[in-house]
Amino acid sequence: MGIRAIVVDTAGTTTDLNFIEDILFPYSAKVLPAFLEENQKNVLVENCICDVQDIALEPDADLARVTEILLQWIEEDRKATPLKTIQGLIWKQGYANGEFKGHIFPDFIEALDGYKQQGLRVYSFSSGSVDAQKLLFGNSDAGDLTDKFNGHFDTRTGNKRFKQAYCNILNTISLSPKQILFVSDVLEELKAASEAGLNVLQMVRQDNQRTGDFKQISSFAEIEL
């Protein structure tokens, strides 16, 4: 295939969706009110609060209202950058306190070593912040995997369901589309990446998963490069 880099989605691809939905999201919702109260004067958190007010079109929203908005966004799985930034900060505390370990599928852990031996570059692209991705892979149940990655992309690169995000990745890593393989479980993301010219594979890890016309795999062990 002439592949020189692999870009992977996280939730549902490298990481069990249940870990995200049943552990990380509820933890961020539980901790959020106290976290905002304690850190509202932190510059990064303060900027996120302002961004929430802007996105919600509520410039005068007080901290209680901002908290309410963010909790609603968590419930809706909203891919808003300020939410993802705050969640990343909350999860950092959780990992540091030993509340949980990042779940990574064993087949991806094994594949990472093979990619490095082949001289392939590996990137992750998630709606979760870059910091949250580093925490996930740096505090995984298999140890620290961060040195096996060449970089990470998040919503600042673009919406994963739009072609432009993948064009932005191409510009950043300076490779042609056909030199990149994108692996995700989400059809809309695969469609957008395909429109940008990337090679794509759909990861199917659940029996009830939506599938389309893209080539499917159920494990990274099935990828032949």
From Swiss-Prot:
Monomer. This is Enolase-phosphatase E1. Belongs to the HAD-like hydrolase superfamily. MasA/MtnC family. It catalyses: 5-methylsulfanyl-2,3-dioxopentyl phosphate + H2O = 1,2-dihydroxy-5-(methylsulfanyl)pent-1-en-3-one + phosphate. GO terms for biological process: L-methionine salvage from methylthioadenosine. It comes from Shewanella piezotolerans (strain WP3 / JCM 13877). Its cofactor is Mg(2+). The gene is mtnC. Binds 1 Mg(2+) ion per subunit. Pfam families: Hydrolase. Bifunctional enzyme that catalyzes the enolization of 2,3-diketo-5-methylthiopentyl-1-phosphate (DK-MTP-1-P) into the intermediate 2-hydroxy-3-keto-5-methylthiopentenyl-1-phosphate (HK-MTPenyl-1-P), which is then dephosphorylated to form the acireductone 1,2-dihydroxy-3-keto-5-methylthiopentene (DHK-MTPene). Its EC number is 3.1.3.77. The keyword Hydrolase applies. GO terms for molecular function: 2,3-diketo-5-methylthiopentyl-1-phosphate enolase activity; 2-hydroxy-3-keto-5-methylthiopentenyl-1-phosphate phosphatase activity; acireductone synthase activity; magnesium ion binding. Pathway: Amino-acid biosynthesis; L-methionine biosynthesis via salvage pathway; L-methionine from S-methyl-5-thio-alpha-D-ribose 1-phosphate: step 3/6; Amino-acid biosynthesis; L-methionine biosynthesis via salvage pathway; L-methionine from S-methyl-5-thio-alpha-D-ribose 1-phosphate: step 4/6. HAMAP family: Salvage_MtnC (MF_01681). Keywords: Amino-acid biosynthesis, Hydrolase, Magnesium, Metal-binding, Methionine biosynthesis.
